[in-house]
Amino acid sequence: MISAKSVDVVERWVGSLTNLVLFVMMGFGLVCGGWSCQAQEITGMKLSDVSFVSELDKTVQKYVVLESDGFRRSTKKTLLVALHGHGADRWQYVREERDECRATREFAMKYGMLMISPDYRARTSWMGPAAEADLKQILAEVRELYSVESIIVSGGSMGGTSALIFGALHPDIVDGIVAMNPTSNMEEYGQFQEAIAESYGGSKAEVPQEYRKRSSELQFERLTMPVAVTTGGKDTLVPPESTLRLVEKLRGADRKVFLNHRSEGGHATTYEDGMQALEFVAEGLRLRQSEQ
């Protein structure tokens, strides 16, 4: 359970990670030009709710950090990014007991990973330009504060779609992708069009380039990292066809890719299937690191 007690503070990091962190109490819930953090506890993990000012538009944005018990910032770690689904926010992967969320948390705990869950312009992000800019900023800041060795971006539904989008846009940043029940083609996807248009800055007809560049199937050659996806044959909310095509293209390019397609499955991934997908990417990272 997440404690209801929290303290708002500003963290200003001066110089290197060994320098003193200056904490200033936050009044009236305002962020004073820096980073603020609410420290809380959940079973087996330390939780921090972080606020920051977006470099893109100067708005206050948020993400949650989860550290496993005994976590040390100086030790090299894998960073696991958990992206929420449509209509949710940063708390989905922290609090919810649905299989996709529980598997992700327990996977991070199992390997002592650092886990973050951003709002990325909740609740209707679909990894539009603002969400993309925020996530890039977050990852840069986290790398300054922690010894991050590799980055896995994961999520379900909109979050899985967004993981693929961000990975294709920034293969130099992302080392592995886990996408549960995603779409891989924003040009053909037909649901949530009003929300997506708001996020992308216009409709498919108005800004076609945004929909194309955010269609991972059409940018598959940029997915050079291990990729694991789950799909359901009877998923009508986010149909699997584009992702099945993406997998075939990645296999044709001899990429490390894992598919768990449940022909009778709907818009959900079981705990076991989610954990299997996460393990595939983790193993891919271990093999890559051993070859370096």
List each language-model region with its residue ranges.
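A domain-start/cap signature at the N-terminus of enzymes
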Residues: 35-77, 287-291
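Short substrate-entry loop that stabilizes the transition state in hydrolases
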Residues: 72-75, 86-125
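The conserved beta1-alpha1 loop
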Residues: 81-85, 231
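Alpha/beta-hydrolase active-site loop
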Residues: 126-145
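C-terminal catalytic histidine-bearing segment of alpha/beta-hydrolase fold enzymes
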Residues: 127, 237, 244-292
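Primarily recognizes the serine-hydrolase "nucleophile elbow" in alpha/beta-hydrolase
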Residues: 149-192
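Short beta-strand/loop motif that positions the catalytic acidic residue
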Residues: 223, 229-231, 235
